Amino acid sequence: MHVTRPKSSKGRSRPMITNSSMIYTPSQPSALSPQPPAAAKTKDKSNQSLRSRAILRRSSQPTTDILTEAYDRPPEEPVSLNRYRVLPSIEKKTSTDNQKCSQCVSRHRKCQHTNARLDVVSDSTPPEESDLLLAIRTPCGQRFKRSFRPSDQLKGVLSAAEAEFGDRFDNCIIETMDVPRRTFSNLTMTLAQCGVLNKSVLCISHDDSEMDLT
């Protein structure tokens, strides 16, 4: 049965569409989704099986090149886990410390022995007498300086004054200028016995007691 289609605006008739063309048959393959042939699939499967077999053979049986490379390789040096220098043992350090201590003790004993010898020598020798610088004043008021020893007597001081000025000092005594003043009529006494110190002043005076008796 043919159905007439109305004409378009331009006067042309539209094509006829049958009902048979509108029916969808799932058994027919679609032109938009092409399927690969079956022969190509079987070929890919065979290639994959051959590759897997070759990989298994290589992994199970190592080649001679790999073995020779492993034997020819030089041995690796052991890696030290300690970055710091190894310290000496405690026993060695203790022995060296003991040696140093013994050396110090021996040196100290030698020094003590030497000092003891020096002390004995200094004690055996008599100490040198230091000179006394004295200022002497005559009865006339004249002065002079002279060095004497502590073991010198007072009459030696009187003789030095007579030699210095060329006069005779008979019936004289010697006095000190210290406070209180001390008078010595016994001219045989030494300066040490009189307690005369360094840089002292001694005065030669006439003995007034003898002058009164005359």
UniProtKB/Swiss-Prot annotation:
Described purpose of this protein according to its UniProt entry = Required for ciliogenesis. Acts as a tethering factor that facilitates recruitment of vcp/p97 to the intraflagellar transport complex B (IFT-B) in cilia.
SUPFAM superfamilies named among the record's database cross-references: Ubiquitin-like
Which species expresses this protein natively? Danio rerio (Zebrafish)
According to the lineage, what is the superkingdom? Eukaryota
* Keyword flag Heme: no
Where in this protein does the record put region Disordered? 1-79
Q: One of this protein's GO BP terms?
A: cilium assembly
Q: What is this protein called?
A: UBX domain-containing protein 10
Record domain UBX: where: 127-204
Q: Where is the composition biased (Polar residues)?
A: 16-25
Any one GO CC term of the record: cilium
Phenotype of null mutants: Defects in left-right asymmetry during embryogenesis, due to defects in ciliogenesis.
Residue ranges with Low complexity bias: 49-60
List, as start-end ranges, the regions of compositional bias called Basic residues: 1-13
Q: Give the family per the record.
A: Belongs to the UBXN10 family.
Per UniProt, the keywords (alphabetical) are: Cell projection, Cilium, Cilium biogenesis/degradation
Tell me if Chloroplast is a UniProt keyword of this record: no
Instruction: Output the Pfam families linked to this UniProt entry.
Output: UBX (PF00789)
Listed InterPro entries: Ubiquitin-like_domsf, UBX_dom
| One Gene Ontology MF term | ubiquitin binding
Spell out the Gene3D superfamilies in the cross-references.
Phosphatidylinositol 3-kinase Catalytic Subunit, Chain A, domain 1 (3.10.20.90)
Compartment annotation: Cell projection, Cilium
Q: Which gene encodes it?
A: ubxn10
